[in-house]
């Protein structure tokens, strides 16, 4: 298969700004060494055939040794009909066509080191890989533009179906590295040029997430609360956190919406402290871990997206030397991570596996 084109892109951890990208706020994300890969081979017909690692392989550290794949066929000469509102492979093809890209037939074989449905942006990373693979396949210059790839991926995964997600996952995967993403005026990415000497340790709770319902339960009441507060001149979470708006106005909300809005205000303040910290020199590990865990506590207590299993993992890790940690992704299950001294990593893993 000498004419095959290979592409890959990483998953990410969200350090700060979880559940805030869809509010038009900032996030800090870091790419990790779990990747989605695609191998693209041209065909002589109008069929795009995607073979993707079987969704049964949905846990960390499971290799596709038996070659288990699911296959999806799309004839681009015909109208594309979605099987569901999560038919992201066909929506990616359809969005590219609607944007005017001249696609042709391809075989695309996809593999992933990323567990599916666990808060590791597997669907976003997959869509980014498909977009890049198809653009590379047709030799389009946009294949070299990570911003363009990320926007197309967002349109295919979120906008096409009216889903409630934000843009962090697509941009973090397409751009990679340690980055501060801002969404207030379009999308801006600011690389953070520093190394982090500690170890990020990722854990799978083995609990399957219901991403759309979790997002709806956290995003919708926050937006509803902010809409109510507009009547009092409040322009958004950033206005309440740093812009001079009277925070006591939040008391005009019912308890449910009030709790969501207050958690987002505090998490925005934590994000700003985190960005300032990451741009400092010197040893920041302990303070960084504490801020990450403070962020998690707002996600747990304010947005209600943690689980008993994830709390048990984080408690055990911190008791055995981790600086801090948090749930990763939309929540309600899936993965969490801790930031820890490298010399403590093995012990932390051993103790959690005991439980």
Predicted regions mapped to residue ranges:
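Gly/Ser-rich oxyanion-binding loop with an adjacent helix/lid
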Residues: 1-13, 21-22, 82-194, 319, ...
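C-terminal nucleotide
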Residues: 2-16, 37-86, 95-98, 102, ...
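Structural signature of FAD isoalloxazine-binding scaffolds in flavoprotein oxidoreductases
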Residues: 24-44
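A generic structural signal for short coil/turn motifs at secondary-structure boundaries
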Residues: 24-26, 116-120, 209-213, 300-301
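Short acidic-hydrophobic sequence patches enriched in Asp/Glu that either
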Residues: 30, 126, 145-149, 163, ...
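FabD-like malonyl-/acyl-CoA
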Residues: 125, 336-339
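Glycine-rich phosphate-binding loops that contact phosphosugars or nucleotide phosphates
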Residues: 333
């Amino acid at each position: 298969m000498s004419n095959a084109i290979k592409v890959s892109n990483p998953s990410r951890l969200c350090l700060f700004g979880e559940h805030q990208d869809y509010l038009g706020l900032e996030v800090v994300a870091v790419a990790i060494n779990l990747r989605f890969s695609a191998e693209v081979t041209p065909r002589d017909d109008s069929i795009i055939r995607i073979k993707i690692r079987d969704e049964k392989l949905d846990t960390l550290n499971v290799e596709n040794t038996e070659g288990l794949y699911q296959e999806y066929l799309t004839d681009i000469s015909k109208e594309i009909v979605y099987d569901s509102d999560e038919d992201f492979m066909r929506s990616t093809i359809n969005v590219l066509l609607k944007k005017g890209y001249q696609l042709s037939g391809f075989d695309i074989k996809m593999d992933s080191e990323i567990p599916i449905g666990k808060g590791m942006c597997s669907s976003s990373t997959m869509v980014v890989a498909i977009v890049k693979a198809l653009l590379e396949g047709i030799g389009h210059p946009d294949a070299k533009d990570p911003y363009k790839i990320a926007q197309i991926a967002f349109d295919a995964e979120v906008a096409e179906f009216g889903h409630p997600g934000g843009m962090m996952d697509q941009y973090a995967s397409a751009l990679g590295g340690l980055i501060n993403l801002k969404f207030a005026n379009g999308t801006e990415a600011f690389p953070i040029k520093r190394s982090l000497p500690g170890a990020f340790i990722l854990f799978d709770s083995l609990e399957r997430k219901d991403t759309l319902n979790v997002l709806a339960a956290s995003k919708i009441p926050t937006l509803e609360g902010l809409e109510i507060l507009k009547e009092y001149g409040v322009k958004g979470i950033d206005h309440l956190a740093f812009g001079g708006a009277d925070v006591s106005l939040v008391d005009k909300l019912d308890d449910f919406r009030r709790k969501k809005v207050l958690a987002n205000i505090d998490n925005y303040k934590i994000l700003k402290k985190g960005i300032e910290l990451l741009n400092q020199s010197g040893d920041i590990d302990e303070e960084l871990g504490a801020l990450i865990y403070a962020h998690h506590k707002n996600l747990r207590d304010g947005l209600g997206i943690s689980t008993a299993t994830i709390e048990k993992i984080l408690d055990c890790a911190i008791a055995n030397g981790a600086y801090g940690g948090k749930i990763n992704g939309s929540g309600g299950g899936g993965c969490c991570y801790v930031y820890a001294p490298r010399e403590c990593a093995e012990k932390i893993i051993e103790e959690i596996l005991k439980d």
